[in-house]
UniProtKB/Swiss-Prot annotation:
Gene3D superfamilies: Sodium:dicarboxylate symporter. It holds the Pfam family SDF. One of its GO terms (biological process) is serine transport. Keywords: Amino-acid transport, Cell inner membrane, Cell membrane, Membrane, Symport, Transmembrane, Transmembrane helix, Transport. Involved in the import of serine and threonine into the cell, with the concomitant import of sodium (symport system). It comes from Marinobacter nauticus (strain ATCC 700491 / DSM 11845 / VT8). One of its GO terms (cellular component) is plasma membrane. Belongs to the dicarboxylate/amino acid:cation symporter (DAACS) (TC 2.A.23) family. This is Serine/threonine transporter SstT. SUPFAM superfamilies: Proton glutamate symport protein (SSF118215). The keyword Cell inner membrane applies.
Amino acid sequence: MSSRRLGVVRPLLQMGLIPQITIGIIAGVLLAVIWPDTAQSVSLLGQLFISALKAVAPILVFALVTAAIANHQQGQPTHIRGVLLLYVIGTLVAAVVAVIASFVFPTELTLELPEVSGNPPGGVVEILRNLLLSAVTNPVSALMEGNFIAILAWAVGLGLMLRQGRDATRQVVNDLSDAISGIVRAVIRFAPLGIFGLVANTLADAGIGALLEYGRLLAVIVGCMLFVALVTNPLIVFLHTRQNPYPLVFACLRGSAITAFFTRSSAANIPVNLNLCDRLGLDPDTYAISIPLGATINMAGAAITISVITLAAANTLGIPVDFPTALLLCVVSSIAACGVSGVAGGSLLLIPLATSLFGISTEVAMQVVAIGFVISVVQDSTETALNSSTDVLFTAAACRSAEVRESA
């Protein structure tokens, strides 16, 4: 009997990670539909998976960045500048797509919802100020709280100082980085079970009924994200590399977007992205920095969410939106999106900042935020999938473009 069970399990264990995750998704959907009570009880699997990813991500980023900079050889190229440029362009283009879609497919909201809790930031200047202050947070607190801006700042500083250290010291840092990476690979092997628990619990708990009332709004948001993922991002990559972008696009969607969709956290998906970059053969010195940095500032999905819901609120209140204001909204959404990294549903709390451009009161804006939380089961998942997969996509594009230039 045991050998028969082993014969059934062995093919599953020998499958690749993506087929295993696909099976986990299907099993989670079936369990939620057939036995919803049981589905809620397996949520522990999903919680354990997300907790493990969030726990290992800060120390992984710290070790990888420190090791990459400490062992960086003078004259050895990195491609961070190109990645940063792509991050900025991608986020701004996503905001423009969202604004255009909102004009073509205008939506309205039913603003009769209870107040929701949250402390939206007071303005763009405050967001930038908080971003700078977070960079000088106590390093121990940064590791405990998952503050990746501070982690990056301290890791870069320590790595630069260790360049003057002994070879043995740098080798210890490198070995520590490899050891933590091994733990991450072990955690990722449990992704199919974790996603099975997340899917089953989400569908059993929320269902699809809550999504139907705001189907048009959700369709515009998700449609914009799909358009960015499948049209504008590939176009940006093509213009940067002059190569067919779609093999790389689909590799990033398979390897990063699926897990990000269910973890709903760019920070939790950092280990997955680092593993994917390694499989794609990218420059470790580049992706060790660009991936955690992208989880903080590359927020195309958040820019889309903020823009679409803000314009829906303006339409509901009958506020006319002219072209200069729409253009300003694109810029504000892009900058504001940088302040929501690693927070499930964080982009929704930036909506009051954007609605203030149209003179919408905070009370009404927070009701709009409440609508965002209703659709967040799909919106936040899709947003994170776009954000996280784009981190790898633009990192790969910058690395490959640089390789072509260097070989020419």
